[in-house]
From Swiss-Prot:
It comes from Beijerinckia indica subsp. indica (strain ATCC 9039 / DSM 1715 / NCIMB 8712). The gene is rplN. GO terms for biological process: translation. GO terms for molecular function: large ribosomal subunit rRNA binding; structural constituent of ribosome. This is Large ribosomal subunit protein uL14. CDD domains: Ribosomal_uL14. Keywords: Ribonucleoprotein, Ribosomal protein, RNA-binding, rRNA-binding.
Length: 122
């Protein structure tokens, strides 16, 4: 469950390390984002010579949340940290690699490129 001012780790090699959510997309009154939702983020920490730099405003897909994800079969999955993958305006990942596991709920939200780059899908 991600809201405005939430800090997230970046799970790709775009050059950003930490980002902060500045808007949840999908309706004017929408307060929270979950796995697979698109948010607008500001890069707070970045590595030198990366594709993005500190202060850049970008879109991102939430790929991991510390809040439980409930599945239709009754099982629950949760992660240790909140993480996102930076995307461009065509909804393609900025980085070429994804780090860490991603849930299969991303498939239902049509983020197939992220699923294919991920080392593990839970």
């Amino acid at each position: 469950m991600i809201q405005m001012q939430t800090n997230l780790d970046v799970a790709d090699n775009s050059g950003a390390r930490r980002v902060m959510c500045i808007k949840v997309l999908g309706g004017s009154k929408r307060k929270y984002a979950g796995v697979g939702d698109i948010i607008v983020v500001s890069v707070k920490e970045a590595i030198p010579r990366g594709r993005v730099k500190k202060g850049d405003v970008m879109k991102a897909v939430v790929v991991r949340t510390a809040k439980d994800i409930k599945r239709a079969d009754g099982s629950v999955i949760r992660f240790d940290t909140n993480a996102a993958v930076l995307i461009n305006n065509q909804s393609e990942p900025v980085g070429t690699r994804i780090f860490g596991p991603v849930p299969r709920e991303l498939r239902a939200k049509n983020h197939m490129k992220i699923i294919s780059l991920a080392p593990e899908v839970l």
